[in-house]
Structure formats: C-alpha cells, structure tokens
C-alpha cells in the first residue's frame, strides 16, 4: 500500500490518544494519530515522524501521523494498514495460491473476524494483528491489554475445532524483525489464549514488512515464539 504527499516532522507531544502536536516547517501542527494504542515507547519528544497530507479540503487538520523513527528503525504505526496490506498480499496469491474469494469483516460465532478466504477446497478464517512494539530486534504483541484480541483467539480456536483453517496473522509493521512473541508481561491472558489456541489447531503466522515513509508491503515470514 502507498501513501500520498508524505512529509517528515518533529514530534512534540500527544495530549490524548487521538491527536499529537508536531513541528512542521517551523510551525506547530495538530495531527490525528492513526493508532489509538499507547505507543509510549515510539512517540518520544523530538523523534521524527511521517505525516500524510489529507485529501479532504474541508477537514480541520491537514495531516495524519502514520509512521515514526525509533533510532535507525522506521515503524509504520497506521492501525488500518495491516488489514490493507494483508488483503493486497492475499489477492496477489501471497497467502494461498488458489483463492476464489476474499471476504472482509466475516461474521463468525459472536465476533467479526478480519477475513474469510475461500479456496476450492475449504474456508480459511484469518484474524490480522498489527505489531508495532519492538525490543532488541524482536516484536511483541500486544502493547496494551486487549480483551477483544483474546475473544478473537477463542473464536479462532472454536473454528479450528470444527475443521476450518483458522489463522492468527501478525503483520509486523517493521523491517528485519527476528521473531514475534506474545507480550506476557503486558497481557498474560492473551499469551495464554494464544498458546492454547495453537495447541488446538490454530495456525499462528507472522510476517514483517518493507517499510518506507510512503509505503508498506508484506515482506517475509518470521518465527513466532510461543
């Protein structure tokens, strides 16, 4: 996926989870943050961030914050991007070679899972999770407790137990990650649910991405350490 009209700016602060203040061309701008997660380890005063200029002339703010530099690493933090890049990749045959249909927002049980992918032989239910937390070259999820994430894992487990191909798919919005693991220190219940689901047939996959200020593309599979 690609962004249009991307500019670099300096992060100042984040008064709430929806907006940030940045310095652009010597002026302070208020910009929506396309990720309502905590992201405290990323949005550090003085860091460089990437902004995409909006296309709606009537909007109150001109830019959206989409990425941040953490040292020498560029991290895409757009919460909408993982589903978009997965859909592009799956449509191009990256996930499965014999796809006949891709249905987003698929109702299953008591949840809506991100995708139902149909092949000639079976249905594949996929829940996508974007990962932005990096420590020493390894990625962790989640960066904050997510009861919704636990619920999705349990729905996937029920699907796997009925014979469907159920997949939890981590899109790591960072390049050159060595591994992905559940963040047990932040949300032990998520890690416990994930390990139980994997033991009952849920496939847990992770791929990192090629990340530039104006693009994000699924790159290669990386190990998941449960």
Where are these regions (language model features)?
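Short aromatic-glycine-enriched beta-strand elements
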Residues: 16-21
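Conserved catalytic cores of phosphodiester-cleaving nucleases, focusing on short active-site segments
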Residues: 9, 113-143, 156
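OB-fold/S1-family single-stranded nucleic acid-binding modules
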Residues: 56-73, 218-219
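A short acidic/basic microdomain associated with nuclease active sites
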Residues: 94-108
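Short nucleic-acid-contacting surface segments enriched for D/E, G, S/T with interspersed K/R
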Residues: 37-50
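Nucleic-acid nuclease catalytic cores
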Residues: 137-147, 154-186, 208
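Short, charged beta-turn/beta-strand-edge "cap" motif at the junction between a beta-strand
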Residues: 13, 53-58
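Domain-level recognition of nuclease-like catalytic cores that cleave nucleotide substrates
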Residues: 173-226
């Amino acid at each position: 996926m690609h962004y249009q009209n991307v500019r670099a700016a300096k992060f100042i602060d984040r008064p709430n989870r929806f907006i940030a203040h940045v310095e652009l061309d010597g002026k302070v701008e208020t910009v929506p943050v396309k990720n309502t997660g905590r992201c405290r380890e990323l949005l550090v005063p003085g860091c460089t961030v990437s902004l995409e200029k909006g296309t709606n002339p009537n909007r109150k703010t001109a830019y959206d914050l989409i990425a941040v530099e953490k040292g020498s690493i560029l991290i895409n933090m757009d919460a909408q991007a993982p589903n978009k890049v997965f859909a592009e990749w799956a449509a191009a045959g990256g996930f499965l070679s014999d796809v006949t249909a891709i249905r987003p927002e698929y109702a299953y049980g008591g949840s809506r899972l991100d995708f139902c992918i149909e092949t000639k032989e079976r249905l594949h239910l996929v829940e996508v999770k974007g990962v932005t937390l990096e420590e020493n070259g390894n990625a962790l999820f989640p960066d904050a407790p997510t009861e919704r994430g636990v619920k999705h894992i349990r729905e996937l487990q029920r699907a796997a137990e009925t014979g469907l191909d159920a997949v939890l798919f981590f899109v790591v919005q960072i390049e050159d990650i060595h591994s992905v693991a559940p963040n047990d220190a932040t949300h032990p219940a998520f890690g416990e649910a994930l390990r139980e689901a994997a033991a009952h047939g849920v496939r847990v996959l992770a791929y990192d991405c090629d990340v530039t200020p104006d693009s994000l593309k699924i790159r290669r599979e990386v190990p998941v350490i449960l």
